[in-house]
Each structure stands twice: as C-alpha cells, then as structure tokens.
C-alpha cells in the first residue's frame, strides 16, 4: 500500500469554530506532517470531539473547507 492509500497525518494547530445545523462539526486548522504537502496548513471540517494537538488522518490534502461566515 502506498502513502496515498493509507492517508496523511495532520496535527490540529487551531480550532476555528463550530458549524453545521446543530454545531456538530468543528472547523480546524491542521498542519500536514507527512507526504507531498508536508508542512502545509489546511482548514478542515472535523466531526466528533477534537482538541489542539490531536492527530487526524486525512485521505487527501487537496481540498480545504470553506471559511466560516460571522453572524
């Protein structure tokens, strides 16, 4: 299996806010730790409990989440 088949580790560096109809999704900034985009910081949506320092396994590193709009 290649690295692309397993996923890419990313560390949560900042929690931006909550989104979704009931606030069930958390938007975070995550730094890619390995692979082609190592060192790049992405904005991603995460479902479930998460805190700064957690490691996420991302299937891909191309797509970023849309920015949260202030209300």
Swiss-Prot record:
Q: Name one GO biological process term.
A: maturation of SSU-rRNA
> According to the lineage, what is the superkingdom?
Archaea
Cellular component (GO) terms are: cytosolic small ribosomal subunit
Please list the GO terms describing molecular function.
Answer: structural constituent of ribosome
Q: Does the keyword RNA-binding apply?
A: no
> Which Pfam families did the record assign?
Ribosomal_S28e
What keywords appear on the UniProt entry?
Ribonucleoprotein, Ribosomal protein
Asked if Ribosomal protein is a keyword of the record, the answer is yes
Q: Which family does it belong to?
A: Belongs to the eukaryotic ribosomal protein eS28 family.
**What's the protein name?**
Small ribosomal subunit protein eS28
Please name the source species. Answer: Korarchaeum cryptofilum (strain OPF8)
């Amino acid at each position: 299996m290649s690295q692309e088949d397993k996923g890419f580790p990313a560390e949560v560096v900042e929690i931006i806010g909550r989104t979704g109809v009931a606030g069930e999704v958390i938007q975070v900034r995550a730094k890619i730790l390995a692979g082609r985009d190592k060192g790049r910081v992405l904005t991603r949506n995460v479902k479930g409990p998460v805190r700064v320092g957690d490691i996420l396994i991302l299937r891909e590193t191309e797509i970023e989440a849309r920015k949260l709009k202030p209300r």
